[in-house]
């Protein structure tokens, strides 16, 4: 099996890691950062931007820049709450009730999985550059409380990115793998994962390389962004009260509020008060309007009591499901940037006596765990075993709309469970199997995963036919359902695909489009790389010219300096004209000119101790000007050469013994 990377696909930031020599290693992206913003955008020229490049245009181009996409993956429109839909770009429901993201500049609507695939593709490309070989497979982490729908959609995003998702791994489990893969002592671990858009808590026992998940719980619509939103609303309401304008109705102003809120939240983790300055945020009848205020930690915490309550309940539920008490927990592992907030850490201290572990990086630990799982799959790590659980109950709808649970939540996976059902009416020739996921008693209150029909049942009185329904969950937490008529042996099975917001035809069409445009994408990327390289070289040339002027004076290397200046102007002109074909030749000329200048500077540095250096610099420059056709190649300051028989030779002429004026 080839190289498999671990990918933490986060709401705010994403990370990729790989196992090298038995140790997980986080891979820096092309911009040099270990985390990549989970942002996708299109420039005004409809050029795809991913990561930091996309994030830079959030304020200036909010309609065509998309963040917090993870909250939309695998979810229907009716599942979204107001906070998730409070984004500067346009989201709407399509005819099937799925979320679609509208892009103004491309005049297209995108499924969230399409945009998320661009993030995965960038992470994989950066990993391939680091490793020096293609990466075609990955372990992708998801929140533990992701349902089957969201897991299927994540797998689809991987397919659209052109990779095989070898394993869907729960984020808290990945964090525990990173924390405990090289520890032998038995520990009971609570993983508290508060990311940008989701929240999970898992309890597991770690001992001698065995990771046994006992219980998991969470909220896929709660994260650090919700805390940001409280600051946004606080600022917007204060501004509205003072000026009568609601900044949340202006896309650019809203994005500036979001960025200021995130910055204030982060700073309040280290200080008690932070200033918030947003000049020219709006325009009123009397001119520009500004926000100049400050936010202190008590005020911020006073905005979020209900959010803290929502963090508390899953922890208590997981403890109850595991059969543990808070005193049984040995270690607390914090995951996600949201766990840096003092009020979150204080909440944990009121629940669990153990101090949170500070030995892991909350932003990177999940990707590191993904790399460990990749090592398990490839056989590089042979002494580790992971026993995960399903986060939500799975069942089917029975008479009266009740939900019959076949696989309760926190059941270890992989697992197979079956039960026998019958018909509700006489002479019923078919039955519909409707699969649901959730904890409510009525099926309609849970999440519908899909349905299929088993036909060909022989006529019989009500309750006589026997239909065996089996649920299979694989190690990825993905579900397959089958139904068998025991009388005829007729069988119908289905891989539940209801979670994906793209059907198979749409997926294949997008894959074909991506393949068709792969060459164009590569050419566009190569063009961008050439432009960036040329700009970098121009910057180097400007610095080198300044160095030469300081070290050698105005005439020390005049010919070489003039050659660099000429070549540099050619490159700049071609960059303005966007003539990439000629640019390559101009860059080569500039490199050659820089080489000549660098050689001259190095030569002067080596002989800098010579007291005649200044004179030699000037005469050398004059020589270059007067004899640039190379008809004076010898250095006049050097002694004449001697032939093999001892004769003295200068410029190809044998010297007479009386030519002493040639000697120094």
Curated annotation (Swiss-Prot):
The record's function comment reads: Acts as a chaperone.
- Keyword Nucleotide-binding in annotation: yes
- Tell me where in this chain the PTM Phosphothreonine is found: 198
Please report the name of this protein according to its UniProt entry. Answer: Chaperone protein dnaK1
The family assignment reads: Belongs to the heat shock protein 70 family.
Q: Which domain of life is it from?
A: Bacteria
Recorded hits in InterPro entries, A to Z, give: ATPase_NBD (IPR043129), Chaperone_DnaK (IPR012725), Heat_shock_70_CS (IPR018181), HSP70_peptide-bd_sf (IPR029047), Hsp_70_fam (IPR013126)
Record's note on what induces expression: By stress conditions e.g. heat shock.
PANTHER family referenced in this protein's UniProt entry, alphabetically: HEAT SHOCK PROTEIN 70KDA (PTHR19375)
Molecular functions per Gene Ontology? ATP binding; ATP-dependent protein folding chaperone; unfolded protein binding
- Keywords for the protein's UniProt record, in alphabetical order: ATP-binding, Chaperone, Nucleotide-binding, Phosphoprotein, Stress response
What NCBIfam families does the entry give? Answer: PRK00290.1, PRK13410.1
